């Protein structure tokens, strides 16, 4: 039986689903706009420059640190042969890679063997960090995704 209470419930369900959908569209676009600004990234390879190794001495005087370069993308830190005598650390800008990524701030990818990783970040000199971790700015999307999925399921099952 169709009642006014059901109509209000359906209306709220649709409104919540629409707001959730708009949130998923709007948030990535605002994040992508921030990536167009220039940032500074360290540019070095520990194979040829010991200053590039971990742990990185970010408290050293600028002249004692690896060179900085202006970057119109994201900073990258790549590690090969992690935690071994052959460990190699490379810090650079994504403009030097043949890669097209969106919203990669504080994202790390592990090598399949587990002996290396590659991390991306979007703040000045952020590739000096020994460990880049997710900063939690995108974690609020998980409950929204669950709620929107549940609401869409409820809406489609009626």
Swiss-Prot record:
Transmembrane as a keyword? Answer: yes
User: Tissue expression, per UniProt?
Assistant: Expressed in mushroom body (at protein level); overlaps with expression of Sh/shaker and nicotinic acetylcholine receptor (nAChR) components also involved in sleep regulation. Expressed in the adult brain and head. Enriched in the mushroom body, anterior optic tubercle, superior protocerebrum, antennal nerve and visual projection neuron fibers projecting into the lobula plate of the optic lobe.
**Propeptide residues according to the Swiss-Prot or TrEMBL record:** 128-158
Q: Which GO terms describe its biological process?
A: negative regulation of membrane potential; positive regulation of circadian sleep/wake cycle, sleep; regulation of circadian sleep/wake cycle, sleep; regulation of synaptic transmission, cholinergic; rhythmic process; sleep
Q: How does it sit in the membrane?
A: Lipid-anchor; GPI-anchor
- Which Pfam families does the entry mention? QVR
Q: Which residues are glycosylated?
A: 57
Lipid attachment site numbers (GPI-anchor amidated asparagine): 127
Q: Which residues cross the membrane?
A: 136-156
Gene Ontology, cellular component aspect: external side of plasma membrane; membrane raft; plasma membrane
- What range does the record give for the signal peptide? 1-32
Q: Which GO terms describe its molecular function?
A: acetylcholine receptor inhibitor activity; GPI anchor binding; potassium channel activator activity
Free-text comment about domains: Consists of a single Ly-6 domain, adopting a three finger fold stabilized by 5 disulfide bonds. The first loop contains a region essential for protein folding or that is required for localization to the cell surface. The second loop mediates protein-protein interactions.
Q: What is this protein called?
A: UPAR/Ly6 domain-containing protein qvr
Native source organism of the sequence:
Drosophila sechellia (Fruit fly)
Gene designation = qvr
